[in-house]
């Protein structure tokens, strides 16, 4: 059996639409082994929305690798242990795709390079902002080209933490993408380009005082926040208690605030305030660090029939 741990991720980070993302210390575990025949899939918790057949996203990702290397197992047993909440904007699909590709490559004897796996994952998901940090960890600036992903990985210091607000409702990424306009004004593009560059500079230099300005956005948040009635209240609350910027995590509905000090008092004060505010939804708060490793293998007892 091969066991792989793959992190959650947050994409966009404000102004970096479809090109910036960070891996977070919240994990799914994928256990796979070759069996004599058939496909067996189990999951914990046993969520009925997770396909247990060939439509399962982890299996689909593994099949991409098998097609690429030209080898197929006789059968597969897949066990999924999921901590990453589904359709909350925390990269659950990217974890399935990147983790499935990573696990399948191990089953195939590591035939694919890291660069090849990064490309296959981004191509399958359609953009690299979640899949690349899920694969390699850290904070990633990435662009999907025709046959490769151009990216830069930045190792995030422990000083910068991520206050993740997770609501009690789901939001389809497809739906949240479909509400975006087909065209934007030139001035809004300029607004985002400048702030995305400022964000990269603030992160790499440690000048976190620039983050409140650098996390502003005009490409997606003004449209998507209407799907999240508490968005402005959560963002304003975070800034009030010292966050260095707050933004939608991916397409939402989760919201992330960046904090670089007074972590315990931030958590206590925000939780107390959440209990007293009139909100449309119930929100859970988790303080997470960045994961700088990405997908990792922590157990290999392979009985794969792959011939090296």
UniProtKB/Swiss-Prot annotation:
A Pfam family of this chain: GHMP_kinases_C
S-S pairs: none
UniProt-listed HAMAP family: Homoser_kinase (MF_00384)
Annotated PROSITE patterns: GHMP_KINASES_ATP (PS00627)
Enzyme Commission number(s) of this protein: 2.7.1.39
Residues the entry annotates as binding ATP: 85-95
Described purpose of this protein according to its UniProt entry: Catalyzes the ATP-dependent phosphorylation of L-homoserine to L-homoserine phosphate.
Organism: Caldicellulosiruptor saccharolyticus (strain ATCC 43494 / DSM 8903 / Tp8T 6331)
Protein name in UniProt: Homoserine kinase
